[in-house]
């Protein structure tokens, strides 16, 4: 209680005992909490913009490079496969170096890869480039780690949801912008082959600029950076290897990885196939297909934050049980809408169902990361990495099984089957149980709960 006046003097937002903000003001730029928020979402926005800058121009690129259906499918798989290992590694890297350095380093390393899209000349180089660009999506883990380090448990779901949601808008924004840039370049009497190559100057430059902003203007923790932490002298020193194994042994992280694989993983898969789906099935032009696909990604602006807000509100009212039930309900509804999307055979109906589906599948991702910060503060980076990797593993598995180009199933049938997989995998949420807070069907075992190592370092869940 005595530290609160000092906290008010040091910070622009009210904070808890760990100096994490207890309020979330998305239109504020005050350091360090809200400045970190804006740098986190903007840098990840640039990564999504770069990674998904290829699909809206795929019709042109495909013709120029003479890509087959198998090439396109394999490239889609490669774009997610590159993020699997990098997301797993990003959690421990954040624990070791801090989110600011991790984000800046990965973005600066992958920005030249984005620029090298202009040099590809064969299906093999196309697949390789998509694989390497996918590494940048690991910055999602650092994004969520950063927000969980800056915001208290009462608002962490909302902070995570808005930071990731606004960032994911990049996957929709690029669907609008890249065709416009390509069209604009061709108006200067530049050939189609050269125009699409020049268009990739924008995402590469944007990604590099945001990385430098994070590096020079960001701050890892409320009290300083990882290399100069102003931590209490009595805080025990953490061992990275111990924290890694501590996180990997936590079964809740594996379940959240599975469910996230069929919320965010499905979202990634849809980003990859939706423009081409409308282009082929309903005979719309490239710009129209891009605009429809953009609406799917742009919904992240409010849908994922809504999921985080729902998780926090249900946590306040019903504790952890409310968060878990929210996750199951929202993701199951998303699965049902995905099944319906594959069954609708009219353009207007498909667009309407797709918009509803986009809201629920993205909200499910937000609800998931409303639970993640409570699994283990000690191994927060590892748990975030496991969950985030689950998203890309789910995308790879779904793309490989249903949209690889070698499948005999139609795209619409594959979309419906993707919804069935969502519903089935979401059932595993019922297995998550916290001794201190309970689960979906069971209350907390306070009577036999003592002082387990894992729960000691959680932020308290609001009643």
Name what the model sees in each region.
Residues 101-115, 321-339:
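Structural signature of the two symmetry-related core transmembrane helices
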Residues 157-183, 300, 384-398:
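Glycine-rich segments within core transmembrane alpha-helices of 12-TM secondary carriers
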Residues 163-222:
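Helix-loop-helix hairpin linking two adjacent transmembrane segments in secondary transporters
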């Amino acid at each position: 209680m005595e530290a609160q006046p000092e906290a008010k003097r040091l910070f622009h937002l009210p904070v808890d005992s760990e100096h994490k903000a207890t309020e979330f003001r998305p239109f504020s730029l005050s350091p360090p909490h809200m400045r970190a928020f804006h740098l986190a979402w903007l840098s990840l926005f640039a990564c999504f913009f770069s990674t998904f800058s290829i699909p809206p121009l795929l019709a042109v690129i495909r013709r120029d490079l003479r890509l087959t259906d198998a090439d396109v499918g394999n490239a889609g798989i490669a774009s997610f496969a590159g993020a699997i290992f990098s997301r797993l590694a990003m959690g421990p890297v954040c624990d070791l170096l801090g989110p600011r350095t991790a984000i800046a380093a990965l973005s600066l390393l992958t920005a030249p890869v984005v620029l090298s899209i202009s040099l590809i000349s064969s299906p093999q180089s196309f697949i390789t480039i998509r694989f390497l660009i996918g590494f940048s999506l690991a910055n999602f883990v650092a994004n969520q780690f950063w927000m969980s380090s800056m915001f208290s448990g009462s608002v962490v779901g909302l902070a995570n949801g808005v930071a990731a949601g606004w960032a994911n808008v990049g996957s929709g924004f690029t669907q609008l912008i890249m065709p416009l840039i390509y069209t604009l370049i061709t108006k200067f009497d530049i050939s189609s082959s050269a125009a699409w190559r020049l268009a990739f100057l924008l995402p590469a430059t944007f990604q590099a600029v945001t990385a430098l902003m994070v590096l020079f203007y960001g701050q890892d923790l409320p009290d300083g950076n990882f290399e100069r932490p102003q931590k209490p002298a009595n805080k025990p020193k953490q061992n990275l290897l111990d924290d890694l194994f501590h996180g990997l042994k936590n079964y809740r992280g594996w379940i959240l990885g599975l469910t996230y694989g069929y919320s965010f993983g499905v979202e990634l898969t849809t980003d990859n196939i939706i423009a081409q789906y409308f282009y082929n099935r309903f005979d719309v032009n490239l710009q129209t297909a891009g605009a429809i696909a953009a609406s799917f990604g742009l919904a992240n602006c409010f849908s994922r934050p809504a999921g985080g807000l729902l998780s926090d509100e249900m946590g306040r009212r019903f504790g952890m049980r409310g968060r878990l039930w929210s996750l199951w309900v929202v993701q199951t509804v998303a699965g049902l809408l995905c099944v319906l999307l594959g069954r609708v055979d009219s353009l207007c109906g498909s667009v309407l169902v797709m918009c509803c589906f986009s809201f629920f599948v993205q909200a499910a991702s937000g609800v998931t990361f409303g639970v993640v910060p409570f699994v283990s503060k000690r191994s927060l980076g590892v748990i975030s990495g496991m969950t985030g990797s689950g998203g890309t593993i789910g995308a790879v598995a779904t793309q490989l099984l249903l949209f690889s180009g070698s499948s005999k199933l139609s795209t619409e049938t594959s979309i419906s089957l993707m919804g069935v997989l969502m519903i089935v995998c979401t059932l595993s949420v019922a297995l998550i149980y916290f001794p201190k807070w309970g689960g979906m069907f069971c209350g907390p075992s306070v009577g036999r709960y003592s002082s387990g190592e894992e729960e000691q370092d959680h932020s308290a869940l609001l009643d």
